[in-house]
From Swiss-Prot:
Organism whose genome encodes this protein: Cucumber mosaic virus (strain CS) (CMV)
Entry protein name: Capsid protein
Keywords, alphabetical: Acetylation, Capsid protein, Ribonucleoprotein, RNA-binding, T=3 icosahedral capsid protein, Viral nucleoprotein, Virion
InterPro entries: Cucumovirus_coat, Cucumovirus_coat_Asu_sf
Residue stretches of biased makeup (Basic residues): 11-21
Length: 218
């Protein structure tokens, strides 16, 4: 072997990787990467249809109509026995009701389940006579007549079901802020007794902008 061959052989020996410094990807590593990719795709799919737990407003769902803003109120139903009903009239703040002729375009209700929620509830909003005492019998009849959309909200293992909003359009009725006291949010507890620490309802009333309102949400 001449000198050049000896030098080349020595260089090749130096280039040989040290044992244990690198190894081919194992089957377990490959399976882990595939599983990670699948979980990532699944999380993206779920997140696309999963509502947030943040306070729901038209800011979070869609823009207000031009020239409109919204007023939000929160309702926390009391204990409702299994198969029974609860109703609460929409009472807006005085700073809003003094502009009682401003038109209302729609009402949005969002169901926010609390940690202990494990029931099925039906939620709707209805215009009710001023004389109505919102008794169980009266509310039961309103749910049965089919005159208003109803949101059926059920316990979901993820914490919140995909469809947790009810949008009630009033634009064709020419309803105004003064009419809101004639409307009520109604809740039916179907399968179990609903406890006081299981559910919160967020209600957004979209109405024409009033002088005390700020800029429209974006």
């Amino acid at each position: 072997m001449d000198k050049s061959e000896s030098t080349s052989a020595g260089r090749n020996r130096r280039r040989r990787p040290r044992r244990g410094s690198r190894s081919a990807p194992s089957s377990a590593d490959a399976n882990f990467r595939v599983l990670s990719q699948q979980l990532s795709r699944l999380n993206k799919t779920l997140a696309a249809g999963r509502p947030t737990i943040n306070h729901p407003t038209f800011v979070g769902s869609e823009r207000c109509k031009p020239g409109y803003t919204f007023t939000s109120i929160t309702l926390k139903p009391p204990k409702i026995d299994r198969g029974s009903y609860y109703g609460k009239r929409l009472l807006l703040p005085d700073s809003v009701t003094e502009y009682d002729k401003k038109l209302v375009s729609r009402i949005q209700i969002r169901v926010n389940p609390l940690r202990k929620f494990d029931s099925t509830v039906w939620v709707t909003v209805r215009k009710v006579p001023a004389s109505s005492d919102l008794s169980v019998a009266a509310i039961s009849a309103m749910f049965a007549d089919g005159a208003s959309p109803v949101l059926v909200y059920q316990y979901a293992a993820s914490g919140v079901q995909a469809n947790n909003k009810l949008l009630y359009d009033l634009s064709a009725m020419r309803a105004d802020i003064g009419d809101m006291r004639k409307y009520a949010v109604l809740v039916y507890s179907k399968d179990d007794a609903l406890e006081t620490d299981e559910l919160v309802l967020h209600v957004d009333v979209e109405h024409q902008r009033i002088p005390t309102s700020g800029v429209l949400p974006v």
